Amino acid sequence: MSEASSTPVKTFSIGFEEQDFSELHHARRVAEHVGAEHHEFIVRPDALEVLPTLVEHYGEPYADSSAIPTYYVSRETRRHVTVALNGDGGDECFAGYERYAVMKFAETYHRLPAKLRKHFVERAFEMLPSGGGGRSFFTRAKRFMRGASLPRVERYLRWVSVFDTPDKHELYSDDFKHETAGWSATSWLEPWFVHANGSGLLDATLLADTMTYLPNDLLVKVDIASMAVSLEARSPFLDHHVIEFAASLPENLKLRGLTTKYLLKKVLKRLLPSENLDRRKMGFGVPIGHWFRGELQNFLRETILSQKALARGLFKPEAVRRLVELHTRRERDFSHQLWTLLMLELWFQKFID
């Protein structure tokens, strides 16, 4: 795009003061490399004053915390342009998520004798320390092990869920368990693995993401956040020609070993710095775990531990308190669980009360 344009392409990126979550320097390097007119913006905890606005715009209990930076980068972008391109769909087309490699590795692990997995390997992993944040090696290793021995669909669901089945059993009130007894997330997800028509595990997982996570989370997030500020966001990777081409590729051109987006990275080697292509994917994560232990702790407690919230009858009060206490004492990382409960309660306050 930069090569085809007679004027510098405008690029936009957003970051955080917490460096573990900020990709600004990587975005800046790419912008400089292609000669773009680059714009940056920092999100700080006080930026969460925008939460009531987001709750109103989404109109449902939408709990993807990256809606915050998406809204802000859309607002900043709209000050310069009316239409912007994003990268949504690239991961689902060309296998960009780490979980695709993990699903493949788990197939090999699954071939070990069940007794060896359960009594030695999994027991050893459970002894690893907790905490350290969702991105720490120990947390990720334990999360992998809790799903590795499950059947494919349940394994995938365990790795993408905020609350897995045991967590929900501990959290839900008896009445809410009764109300939801006839439904399972597995039954909602499984048809997409079946519809893969005998394709390999990778293609089946890509299809499941394309038909669930992409339209129900990512596209909702970007569409609402961008249109809230009158910005039109377009996704070139979702052009049907690109999707059809990616679907025709053999799996080993999308995921090779542990290398995600294999073909896409090969093509881009002549265009982008190698340090950008070869680094680990971060995603559009938000340091909500830090914020819940700092500036937003009081707001969190006052919202989800309020008398009104605890009296709704959906969750066991002691289970909600436990999540808050363990997280704020840094004993466990319940960032995403607490964010989900927070957004649900804010939605109740806005639309139900």
Residue ranges and their predicted role:
Residues 1-10, 84-93, 234, 268:
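A phosphate-binding catalytic loop at a beta-strand-loop-alpha-helix junction
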